[in-house]
From Swiss-Prot:
One of its GO terms (biological process) is arabinan catabolic process. The gene is abnA. GO terms for molecular function: arabinan endo-1,5-alpha-L-arabinosidase activity. This is Arabinan endo-1,5-alpha-L-arabinosidase A. The active site is at D34 (proton acceptor), E200 (proton donor). Keywords: Glycoprotein, Glycosidase, Hydrolase, Signal. Pathway: Glycan metabolism; L-arabinan degradation. Residues 1-19 form the signal peptide.
């Protein structure tokens, strides 16, 4: 989640794009940004984590809601000694060996002084979280990447974290067998050589024989003060590979490290700037793409962002919503 100011001086809405389903129903507290979604193993309660308010989160009996506020995951902020440690970003939630892991980012807009932290809980109830501080995944102006927007995946017996935003875009690092810290150095998965290299928010999901690398492209934020030119707002793309560690290509065969990327979801109807996505394999619905978006009938401020979700059809070999 990296904010850029658009050069556009007049607000321009994205052209309507036909063919996308509207977001699924949502009731209760539906405002979110960079959502992270999981269902509790013990009772099936859904939890939705969000950027802001030291990782705010809500819970519900259904993905449709009604979502009710739980509070802040880390009400005292992060122990990571960086600017932004009281304004945490981009939560990614997983269930690992009986614990719920939430990776989060500490940074400030436009800065590479960033780090990825970890908090854990047995129940996800308010007040139950332990902050473990930095995972060792960090960046500074000396790096060619920005260590934000974490995403954990377990593949072929190894945990990996995918991360990155702008600069050289999306990276991956293998984690230790208990994924609290990086195990080795990182390497590039996706890069857009054009313009401002506007790719971030990666999320990897395995389906069938492929690993799908979803990511957000374009301008994420600040639409109420500087509307991007049509098509430059947030949208969701994907590449795929038979390996979790590289060789990702789009549906045309273009490498994801060379600007490749197949469109999954973009502005349409009352949906503007969808992004900050993840994928959850729901026991009732199957694979679900979840994300935040601006509902054009509500507003364009960052605080107006809504929780969106759609079921995914993989029958063509590529995700369709």
């Amino acid at each position: 989640m990296y904010q850029l100011l658009s050069v556009a001086s007049v607000p321009l809405l994205a052209s309507l794009v036909h063919g996308y389903a509207d977001p699924g129903a949502c009731s209760g507290v539906c405002t979110t940004h960079d959502p992270g979604l999981i269902r509790r193993e013990s009772d099936g309660t859904y939890f939705l984590f969000s950027t802001g308010n030291k990782i705010s989160y809500v819970s519900a009996s259904s993905i449709e809601g009604p979502w009710t506020s739980v509070g802040s995951m880390l009400p005292d902020g992060s122990s990571i000694d960086l600017d932004g440690n009281d304004d945490l970003w981009a939560p990614d939630v997983s269930y690992v060996d009986g614990l719920y892991y939430v990776y989060y980012a500490v940074s400030t807009f436009g800065s590479q002084d960033s780090a990825i932290g970890l908090a854990t809980s047995e129940t996800m109830e308010y007040g139950s979280w332990t902050d473990h501080g930095s995972t060792g995944i960090a960046s500074s102006s000396a790096k060619i990447y920005n260590a934000i927007d974490p995403n954990l995946i377990y593949a072929d017996g190894t945990y990996y974290i995918n991360f990155g935003s702008f600069w050289d875009d999306i990276y991956q690092v293998p984690m230790k067998s208990t994924p609290t810290a990086a195990a080795s150095s990182s390497y590039n998965l996706a890069y857009d050589p054009s313009g401002t290299h506007a790719e971030e928010g990666s999320y990897m999901f395995q389906y069938g024989d492929y690993y799908y690398l979803f990511y957000s492209a374009g301008i994420c934020c600040g639409y109420d003060t500087s509307m991007p030119a049509s098509g430059e707002e947030y949208h969701i793309k994907v590449c795929r590979s038979t390996s979790p560690t590289g060789d990702f290509v789009d549906s045309d065969g273009t490498a994801c490290t060379d600007g490749g990327g197949t469109m999954v979801l973009e502005s349409h109807g009352e949906v503007y700037g969808p992004g900050g996505q993840g994928v959850y394999d729901d026991p009732n619905l199957g694979p679900v793409l979840y994300y935040h978006y601006m509902n054009t009938t509500i507003g364009y401020a960052d605080s107006d962002a809504q929780f969106g979700w759609n079921t995914i059809d993989f029958s063509s070999g590529w995700p369709v919503v």
